[in-house]
């Protein structure tokens, strides 16, 4: 459930990095639309994400956030509209083609090989970036050249000491951290994170906030999260979706007091 009341009322605003100035558009959607058998999940969405920015997409369940992510990364084909990545038109491209143009994403649900170690996961991801592509049944020797870089990426997400532990034995927060290491292994210019703190306790949430801050350096990040503390702590731009449409956009401070957002999400409670 989207905790809108925790976002829109009271509280001290967290500090975030300022919005990049004089930068180009890293990711852009124009009139992006998706229909599923008569149901419009995404409705003429216009979105601009600036290079180096951290941009949050928020809204209740069913607002179209994940569908929008799927459209931006090629997992779902749009019914109408255009998507560009640094001026390259990627509309309708396959996910791997978009990845090679510098866009990578995580998913809401963790999807790891339980018997592989974090190091093996990252080595395979690094291998997948090369012309060799993913070749799962290769000898350990063939992955050895990726060993040092894999360890660096694992250290970056706080998993250095767990590099040789089977992924199935990792705690939930550690699995999410491993997924971020896998996304980082693709060396993306634009990183999309779908609910990176979903299902986490308070301590894991705070660790994840710091982790995203680290991996965002030198990159453009777009993320979805229902936790408004996370949004306020990370995002220098926020887009609010409702029923597949853009309801409001601005800084966290601006959007949290936008009358359209207050009316949409707190109107009934305030009238009661």
Specify the residue positions occupied by each region the protein language model found.
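Glycine-rich phosphate-binding loops of nucleotide-dependent enzymes
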Residues: 2, 8-272
